[in-house]
Amino acid sequence: MATPNGPRVPCPQAAVARALLFGLVLIQGAGVAGTTDVVVAYNITWKSTNFKTILEWEPKPINHVYTVQISPRLGNWKNKCFYTTNTECDVTDEIVKNVRETYLARVLSYPADTSSSTVEPPFTNSPEFTPYLETNLGQPTIQSFEQVGTKLNVTVQDARTLVRANSAFLSLRDVFGKDLNYTLYYWKASSTGKKKATTNTNGFLIDVDKGENYCFHVQAVILSRRVNQKSPESPIKCTSHEKVLSTELFFIIGTVMLVIIIFIVVLSVSLHKCRKVRAERSGKENTPLNAA
């Protein structure tokens, strides 16, 4: 059978296929070109103190914006901080729903003109974060203190958190219970040698030397933690006996002065009487001589 020698007629199906393939390549190329200026986030970190939690990352955007998503380990993603030019996002309201849960966040990068984006945005995942185990403890506050004789009584005030239960904000003690300890460091004002006492309540009652002034500060501690166990130390407070000593000294000086005044008055009266008696005697003795 002879083979036709005429010109080959193009197949319509093949032409359509080539056109579709070319179009797909163009679309992919446009997608790649559209994302070349989008920089993905890096150095994503959780900054959390007393459960107030901020997600931070780099870099500052130039031609793009960010959206943050957060999710419990086995939950669904929830969008936060939509199309922002900031490099931080407050996610406190999400993590306080269950502070014992482990959370993951991711930062998505979009072109500045998000309406032109037709591809899935690139993103970067954060490290996992468990608030109960990892939030930093804030600086505690000494609510009150009193030294009476040989006893020093110190009361620590619990910080409030944004964790809620029954529509009320909880304190650190409410959240951590007996896991929360306080350590009191104290020393004589005239010395540098420190002692310490620890309690899982909010009060200290320690033995001290009577008449000595003491200085002290407290620190919150979660002993069950492996990291972030301790808070910063509270400002130093000191007892003072200056007013008591001044009152006692004033009383002593006043008493001595009163005794001296009484002594002077008595002495003056006595001397006056003695002089009067002597004068009378002298007058009697001199009377006959004067008469003569």
UniProtKB/Swiss-Prot annotation:
It is a single-pass type I membrane protein. The chain crosses the membrane at residues 249-271. GO terms for molecular function: cytokine receptor activity; phospholipid binding. PROSITE patterns: TISSUE_FACTOR. Keywords: Blood coagulation, Disulfide bond, Glycoprotein, Hemostasis, Lipoprotein, Membrane, Palmitate, Signal, Transmembrane, Transmembrane helix. It is found in: Membrane. It comes from the Eukaryota. It holds the Pfam family Interfer-bind. Residues 36-248 are extracellular. Coiled coil: none annotated. The keyword Signal applies. Glycans are attached at residues 43, 153, 181. Residues 272-292 are cytoplasmic. A lipid is attached at residue 274 (S-palmitoyl cysteine). Disulfide bonds join 81-89, 215-238. A motif (WKS motif) lies at residues 46-48. Gene3D superfamilies: Immunoglobulins. GO terms for biological process: activation of plasma proteins involved in acute inflammatory response; blood coagulation; cytokine-mediated signaling pathway; positive regulation of angiogenesis; positive regulation of endothelial cell apoptotic process; positive regulation of endothelial cell proliferation; positive regulation of platelet-derived growth factor receptor signaling pathway; positive regulation of TOR signaling. GO terms for cellular component: cell surface; extracellular matrix; extracellular space; plasma membrane. InterPro entries: FN3_dom (IPR003961), FN3_sf (IPR036116), Ig-like_fold (IPR013783), Interferon/interleukin_rcp_dom (IPR015373), Tissue_factor (IPR001187), Tissue_Factor_CS (IPR030472), Type-II_Cytokine-TF_Rcpt (IPR050650). Residues 1-35 form the signal peptide. Initiates blood coagulation by forming a complex with circulating factor VII or VIIa. The [TF:VIIa] complex activates factors IX or X by specific limited proteolysis. TF plays a role in normal hemostasis by initiating the cell-surface assembly and propagation of the coagulation protease cascade. Interacts with HSPE; the interaction, inhibited by heparin, promotes the generation of activated factor X and activates coagulation in the presence of activated factor VII. Belongs to the tissue factor family. This is Tissue factor. It comes from Bos taurus.
